[in-house]
Amino acid sequence: MKTQKEITISGVGGQGMILCGTLIAEAAAVHEHKKATLSSEYGVETRGTFAKSDVIVSDEEIYFPDVTEPDLVVCLHPVAYARYAGKIGGALLLYNSDEVTPDEIVPGPQKGLAITKMAKELGNPQTANILTMGAIAGLTEVITPEGAKEAIRRFFKGKSDKVIALNEKAFDLGYGAGCGLREE
């Protein structure tokens, strides 16, 4: 059984993919004592250009830090979907169904999740990245909810209890949705 998971989280700048990947790597390495690597790519503009975060989590040593054979590719924006759809082998492609219209002829498994809508229903569209983190955790079981929430609390330390609670709620909502997708 493969103990290493390779995940690409992609979209455009301003959607929080870098933070999402960072928190997954921290949850795995610091709070769950696994091995993890993180790399990011983004344009010089802070918003609107392609951006991605690559995370590898393993129970064993990781000898090459870049994602080469992804298990999961997350696309939060049409720009990212166009870049990866049909080009990722047998990896599962998880897309934000509020932003991306999937191409039905693209080979390989694809699943949509209404990430933007769920974030708006929580009252804060900026929680979409934490929702995505939860969905990834629920879908892949790469990190536990406990480890994820420790990373969330550490990152938002110094913010109000309301902000921390909102982000934990966003994680839980995404986690439940991800578990549901895993069971499909």
Where are these regions (language model features)?
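Active-site cofactor/cluster-binding pocket
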Residues: 1-184
